[in-house]
Amino acid sequence: MGKIIGIDLGTTNSCVAVMQGTQPTVIENSEGNRTTPSMVAFTKNGDRLVGQAAKRQAITNPTNTIFSIKRFVGRKFDEVPNEKKIAPYAVVNEGGEARVKINDKTYSPQEISAMILQKMKQTAEDFLGEKVTEAVITVPAYFNDAQRQATKDAGRIAGLEVKRIINEPTAAALAYGLDKKTSSEKVAVFDLGGGTFDISILELGDGVFEVKSTDGDTHLGGDDFDQKIIDFLADEFKKQEGIDLRNDPIALQRLKEAGEKAKIELSSRTDTEINLPFITATQEGPKHLVINLTRAKFEGICADLFAKILEPCQRAVKNSKVPMKEIDEIVLVGGSTRIPKVQALVKDFFGKEPNKSVNPDEVVAVGAAIQGGVLKGDVTDVLLLDVTPLSLGIETLGGVMTKLIDANTTIPTKKQEVFSTAGDNQTSVEVHVLQGERSMATDNKTLGRFHLGDIPPAPRGLPQIEVAFDIDSNGILHVSAKDKATGKEQSIKIEASSKLTDAEIEKMKEDAKAHAEEDKKLKEEIDIKNSADALIFSTEKQLEELGDKIPADKRPAIDGALEKLKDAHKNGTTETIQSGMEELSKVWSEVAADLYKEEPQGNPEGGSAPEGEKKGDDGSVENAEYEVIDGDDKK
């Protein structure tokens, strides 16, 4: 059995980690970064880009670059009015579900998420040197049942068996407390990421991580702060020039990148200049956007967002029944906790400095890896007791929601309650399963409905229908209803409201595998073309340097093989390029042998490769790419 990796599938960035012995390790991706942008792009020539490659081309390809897909996962089309309004890509209604439309094809949010998960899976496989099939994936603590199930589906599509869905603040607490198993602490984990906000109160001691309460807002995160800056810039430019940049997808994408950059800069500076030359043009000529944004102004335009942070904190502390003065540490998680105003709010609310000892971008993935180690048996003496974030119940007479399991109940858990019929001679009942905190059924989220039939006719109130709720360790719900008189039972596993069928998931898995093969083939083609290009370059260079030293009777064969390889490189297949390389190498090696009889000379095969190139394992020459990074840019 291989390793169980831990994946933080974030709104803005994703991260993967794995246990190496007793220590968790965050894995660098192929670009050398420890986090990967949660972005997927489809290019005009049909290529699919994931991560940094997708982010790099977003400005020139905004309508085909998908970001913040996590905000659509497990949600109906009519549940995401604000999200679809600000997305530059098309979000369409397909049978009530929110789907992304790229060209003529629609993708479910689970499919797009699976593409990001595949990238994380490949990153782990490259690091470990073995296949990875199992993972622990994190979700916001305040994700509902539908969103959790949809995340599991995304894992399946990516070719992963999701061993556990774990709440992000709980994962962070695991990472924070792993080396503190002998001490006892009460900890608040404050997790403000790219798209969601969670606050959890936990008690840590003797290897037990017990969640006392959790609360949050799945519509509050770094994206929302970015949007405030985007709107501010667009409004200011409209005042100055009379042009609304929000109507231009490319200009809007430039505003988005500038807004995110400005937000980051204002964490360490009190003001920043946003300078976007040639943002648009009129008959009078090009227009440039130059606006100065101060930290005070940023805090002013985001005042309503900062205010929204405190309410979940108040509820979480109240529901935990832990006095504020007994909370030992406030651990900051998520990139948005770097905002100075957020840190000040946390300090004012809890009355103490927040703990910044963990890396806010990586700690959740580290915790997921630790949970993977627990499941594998590699990490011992750790017990995780999580809670369900929202109350669960059914609709009863009068449209009332009757709760069976209250919010912040430790999971896994099971609860049964007996109900009866509402009418005389009623032979069937509908069980309408709900999640939420409101009194009326219509104000809560519907998780599913099912019917229990063949109830013997009887006066109302006489039949006894036992309804059982069972929440597993992933926080996913199973419901059953049983007629106690006949023993007849009906059960349902509550799936996501945007549930994909098994057939759809299998098809998506096959598509994902096919894309993985395509990506592998494309990389092989690029590698061999690069090798051929390097061989052509070094051969021409040697021909120029050696000149008349090359025997005249050998020159036609070299020139012929060189031209043949050039033609194959331009128009040929992988096979013809490989054949051309072998032929040129063979001809050159014969010439090199003659030359070496006279005096040693460098050559493409036998001598030193030109500077900036390196020999491949097969003897071919690869280009070595270098990137110069300014010291200020390297963070």
Swiss-Prot record:
Keywords: ATP-binding, Chaperone, Nucleotide-binding, Phosphoprotein, Stress response. Residues 624-635 have a biased composition (Acidic residues). InterPro entries: ATPase_NBD, Chaperone_DnaK, Heat_shock_70_CS, HSP70_C_sf, HSP70_peptide-bd_sf, Hsp_70_fam. Induction: By stress conditions e.g. heat shock. The modification Phosphothreonine is found at T196. Pfam families: HSP70 (PF00012). Residues 594-635 are annotated as: Disordered. GO terms for molecular function: ATP binding; ATP-dependent protein folding chaperone; unfolded protein binding. The keyword Zinc does not apply. NCBIfam families: PRK00290.1, PRK05183.1, prok_dnaK. Acts as a chaperone. This is Chaperone protein DnaK. It comes from Chlorobium phaeovibrioides (strain DSM 265 / 1930).
